[in-house]
Amino acid sequence: MFTNPIICALDTHDINHALLLTKMLYGRVSMVKLGLEFFTAYGLSGVQAIADCGVPIFLDLKLHDIPNTVSKAISVIASLNVAMLTIHVSGGREMMIRAMDSISGSVTKLVGVTVLTSMDDSDLKEIGVNESPVQQVMLLSKLAREVGLYGIVCSAFEAKEVRNRYTEKDLKLIVPGIRFDSDCNDQKRVKSPKDAMLAGANYLVIGRPITMSSDPVQTVEDILLSISKCI
């Protein structure tokens, strides 16, 4: 059975534009992603306004703080019943366990961010991480699996390695950094939708290629057609 893997990233602080896109993409994408830019501008009420359009929400806040702070923040966010919420796996085991406890009873699934797609080997070394992105993602995916997170966020470059170790029942793979050409913007580890799906992705986070398109609906349809044989 075909499952729509597209999550459209609404990386904007313009709520009217976000509402317009969400209504336009209703029934055509699996979720819309709201990030820190939107949440800082509009908070819980802004997220609720988008949710009222009927499209499931992927709230990408990448929470990373001491366990108690993250736990209390999630207790507040849980009332929104978003589909997925991100935390940083590098926040550690205790932080993730407390986060899982706080989300208990909610429909929200916790997803762990591993290595940002804006980072490469040299960036990791600058912050004291000597492993390659693949090695670091594998280390963090193991921790995420042990804690019981629903899935992880990783680039398509690491997805194949993770999928070779863990089945879809173990960890869902949410893959950002999806591009169609050489325009990578501020991301370094990027691949096409088809390549990401073949690597084992369950969800593709796609922003600018859709939101900056002259015809977002047609762009989504084109993406779905390009990956239909990979599902």
UniProtKB/Swiss-Prot annotation:
Homodimer. PROSITE patterns: OMPDECASE (PS00156). This is Orotidine 5'-phosphate decarboxylase. The lineage of its organism: Bacteria, Pseudomonadati, Pseudomonadota, Alphaproteobacteria, Rickettsiales. Substrate binds at residues 11, 33, 60-69, 117, 179, 187, 207-208. Gene3D superfamilies: Aldolase class I (3.20.20.70). It catalyses: orotidine 5'-phosphate + H(+) = UMP + CO2. Its EC number is 4.1.1.23. SMART domains: OMPdecase. One of its GO terms (biological process) is 'de novo' pyrimidine nucleobase biosynthetic process. Pfam families: OMPdecase. It comes from Ehrlichia chaffeensis (strain ATCC CRL-10679 / Arkansas). CDD domains: OMP_decarboxylase_like. The keyword Transport does not apply.
